[in-house]
């Protein structure tokens, strides 16, 4: 494949846009560099770049596009609303209707507020938890990404009793001192952190199913024990479901797993491809948010009519019968096909799949912890990524990211992807 126009546009982009991209994950730095492909349009499961190349897309904008690009029902809803106005600065009936559908699907969302991104949603749940508990510190799990606000860009200390350190320039050490990071799926480390810090801990921030170092399930009993230990300590449980809400079934991962948090942050999928974030939870906690309570959160674009209309249309597609069964079937076909090819070519790799999402790790052990992904073979992934890209398969340019299937992928798309993987693996020997 030729990428002449992408390379030209990337050089031009570097003149005007810092680093040539508006989010660092879009660069190819993690796969050895080079100009990222510049896309022109998307339809269904496919993307088309400025050089005219066609791709089967498993990036899906890092997760939001579960119904594929330019889904007719969602596109029609957006166009119709745009003709009526995109922003009023007043309450709308659309906000009410969307909130109602979300609470019907996720019962723990007793009260809901909308924001504009997952970062805002998580940031605000932490503020609300602090207001409710009158405590300051939070616990999070290593490897989970919760947005780019200061409080969650904190690296782990040397153990559960140790405070974190800034994971980005510009994050004050004083902020990092409010965060304790422990390993996911390690309940004893979590218990040790709670026992040490006790009433300092306002909340624990959890991805109930991890989506930020690939797709990783909680070990049996882990989430239940986190809930018990937390509540015994007066600590709130916040679920970051920005990736997982409506990913695996019509609802949130918490309902699939049978574990209920106190607060939930959501985003990505529920916006139907438009910017969105939201949070909600127990009414007695949510009532601490302005205008009813002292915890302030506001936003000019929050609950804007365009995103609300797109979100409603998105849920109307996902609530149809058989949607998630199809995603699971396609995911299984892709997983089983990749595994056969791994065995055929004697590739050191393992697969984690959860319904219609999966991650291919270049390591010889089943992945349950962040350190395993960190230590996996990044060079092998980079080689695989480029070999797949050159055959028209678009993956996330990072060994930490997942592959996402959509309602628009077909068995033929899976088979074509497996043909590409067969070739890629043959070149990696």
Swiss-Prot record:
Enumerate the cofactors the protein uses: pyridoxal 5'-phosphate
The main place the protein resides is: cytoplasm
Entry keyword annotation includes Membrane: no
Q: Which domain of life is it from?
A: Bacteria
> Catalyses which reaction?
(S)-4-amino-5-oxopentanoate = 5-aminolevulinate
**InterPro entries given in the database record:** 4pyrrol_synth_GluAld_NH2Trfase (IPR004639), Aminotrans_3 (IPR005814), Aminotrans_3_PPA_site (IPR049704), PyrdxlP-dep_Trfase (IPR015424), PyrdxlP-dep_Trfase_major (IPR015421), PyrdxlP-dep_Trfase_small (IPR015422)
Q: Name one GO molecular function term.
A: transaminase activity
Q: Which residues carry this modification: N6-(pyridoxal phosphate)lysine?
A: 268
EC number(s) given by UniProt: 5.4.3.8
Query: Pathway it acts in?
Result: Porphyrin-containing compound metabolism; protoporphyrin-IX biosynthesis; 5-aminolevulinate from L-glutamyl-tRNA(Glu): step 2/2
A single GO cellular-component term on record: cytoplasm
Q: Which UniProt keywords apply?
A: Cytoplasm, Isomerase, Porphyrin biosynthesis, Pyridoxal phosphate
Instruction: Give compartment(s).
Output: Cytoplasm
Question: What is one process in the GO biological process aspect for this record?
Answer: protoporphyrinogen IX biosynthetic process
| Quaternary context | Homodimer.
Recorded family membership: Belongs to the class-III pyridoxal-phosphate-dependent aminotransferase family. HemL subfamily.
Protein name in UniProt: Glutamate-1-semialdehyde 2,1-aminomutase 2
